[in-house]
Amino acid sequence: MASPRAFTALMSLALLVAGCQGAEAESFTRLPVPKPPAVQGQQPVLWVSLAAHLGPQPLLLEGASAPLQLRDAQGERVSGRRLSLRWVQQPLPEPLEIRRSVLGPFASFEAAEQAALAWNALGVAAEVAHPREWEVWAPADLAGPKGYPVRQVQQRLTQRRVLQLNTASGWRSLQGPVQLQAPGGLRFNGGVFAGPFRLQADAYGSWTLVEQVPLERYLQGVVPHEIGAGSPPAALAAQAVLARTWALRNRHRFAVDGYHLCSDTQCQVYSDPRQAGSAVRQAVSRTTGQVLALNGEPIHAVYHASNGGVSADEDEAWPLPELRYLEPSLDWRSAPPPGLTLPLDHQEVAALLARQSGVVGAAHPLFRWRRQLDQASLRKGLGARAASLGSPLKPVVLERGPSGRVVRLAIEGPGGQVVLERDAIRRTYRQLPSTLFVLSPSGTGRWSVVGGGFGHGAGLSQAGAIDLAARGWSVEQILSRYYPGAQLVPIQALPAEDHRGAL
């Protein structure tokens, strides 16, 4: 174990000792925080980040209609309608060495989690972190699992970031975590949130504003932002079930930072629940406590805006093990036309993209789309990786999945190639709404990209759900179409929290 002084330094950060590498090195894998509480019971509560990576920029918190009530870890209490906070650097009693092995960055949590599981299978205590990008962390000086390059990171910490509150007598240091009550709501990011709240340190030395929000209230802040408040009732209800299921399945997503979920597109977009209209509230109420499950576990309830006429399987989006409820299928109102059978090759994808009539969800604005790639955009997407390739660059589709989506795309040059896989394709070239596309030359150093759909394509197509609901389909029929074999069950039927969830 580390020396008493090093241990005291960690405790002064309100963190638990973890990743200790021995007395001589006195190094740690990371600055750990306590895990969030279990998400369980008939009325589970989620810890959701409203703002992450806080500091050193100041933070102003404002009560919507009543004073805020603040209490820090030492019992200091302050009340005020507006609370002005800042972070300052203070020296540690003794420097701390942070050393770790790192995989990534990854394009998504799903890809990072699979890498962590591969490392776990080798007996390595690996975990997913999100300092700015998705990474996997483990103790220092370890080899990565097969196929994953590993790098070593070392930091020497001599200061800590301390939270301070502006009072009538000057700036007062606060000991985290800080509890915050908002009897009249907290005005934040254009909305009003009921709370309660916490300000707490994360694994990176910055801070997070967390709302402790009951699951059903959380859904009121998610559903309208994910599918649109004006969607038909059955589509709203389907979205409520999926958002509830997704939240439970992903409750471990930010465990390294001491909370469950974020509130942006890395999770589900969550905003002011008070702005939910009656249709959204009815959809949440109508499905209260209902989740999609298989074998007693919440499914991987992924969804997206538009599948372009064909659903993807899980392996076309992320390197996940086979999930039998996520399977490729042509999303037609009746039988698909002759000549379109799975798996789709290049010609069949082109034929699919030439069609719109008879396809479910064809009203979405990105159901069909066109983009251009040129030398500048190819190089910009790759960033530093393009330097060794030389000029000119050329995109080449190496492999398609069963639905015809591109799962391996090479950017080739005289000096070699960079191969992008699955979700890394759209992360690298964000102008592409999906990976359901065909490439064709459109001049020297230019390519036309004709595609369909918006998003990864796995699971429910929101445009499809809206279309089907408008045609009289029930919520049960919609969910059964996009997740065959999964069952609607009450939350009480799920097993106790295990902080990981089931694939």
Which residues make up each language-model segment?
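Conserved, single-site charged/polar hotspot
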Residues: 2-503
